[in-house]
Amino acid sequence: MKQCILKAASVTLPLVLRTKGKQHLSILIYHRVLPKYDFMRPSEPTIKEFDWHMSLVSRCFTPLSLARALELMDRGELPENAICVTFDDGYADNESCALPILKKWNIPATVFVATGFINGGRMWNDTVVETIKCAGEYIDLRKVGLDEYTFNDSQSKRIVAQKILTKIKHREVEHRAEAVDFIESLAEQLLPNDLMATDQQILNLEAAGVEIGGHTVNHPILAKLNDRHAQQEIVDGKKHLETIIGKKLRYFAYPNGKLGDDYLESQVRIVKEAGFEAAVSTTWGVSARNSDRFQLARFTPWDKRSGKFLLRLLLNQKSVKL
């Protein structure tokens, strides 16, 4: 029955929304594709889940590279239900887990890499998550302006980790770093140092046709930085990646990606002046010919059921939220 419903939906929903899907571009955001389910990261798809995501994208949409999509959008020639797949941050599993599936379904992609964490580094949020994951029954973080936390099960650890991330995400860079360093000092085992891509994995992605894009060096909240510091983050990350892949970077993704909260209009100008051709945000919706090329909308598909995943993607063409 489930397969019948899915088949019917995959045929009828694109037809129903066809007029709305013309000249609209959906851009999907992913971060990781996991070898197996991680209770601390329930929203990150496993290999199996990502495979059916891409199956539906391939069968029900028109997947395009970001470059091709923007070219067609400029000419007013976007195909119906055009879609792009992007990844943020530069995780190793983009190459080891996602790339084989992208190849299987012949789906282009763009990976935006924060260069400060590649080759054995670890993003600050992963340090928090991994520390809480291996914690015992109690942790005291009052020293860095947080609380005492008690853990009963895996769900309580996940909830606490999310609370901590929310509380420290928008702290000044140095204050956030101090909190993360303290949290890491309480880790009860060595934390993984292989979460992020290596230079070779970035080269493997690029050689396979994946577009590599800029995502700053240290993934800061750009809105917290002055323009000089923001420019340094944006430009240095771009130059580092250009050195690795031996070609010019064309696209940029704002860390966290909400205008006002995470980046400012002045930093949009910096991205333009740095030589990027376009940039993506995390504002939900679709992009069209008249959209700001340096603040393109993106969309996160998190559904675990194929029917609702498909429906959400299709309704995003109308910017309808479920």
Regions found by a protein language model. Name each.
Residues 115-119, 285:
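Short beta-alpha junction loops
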Residues 112-114, 215, 282:
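Generic beta-sheet signal
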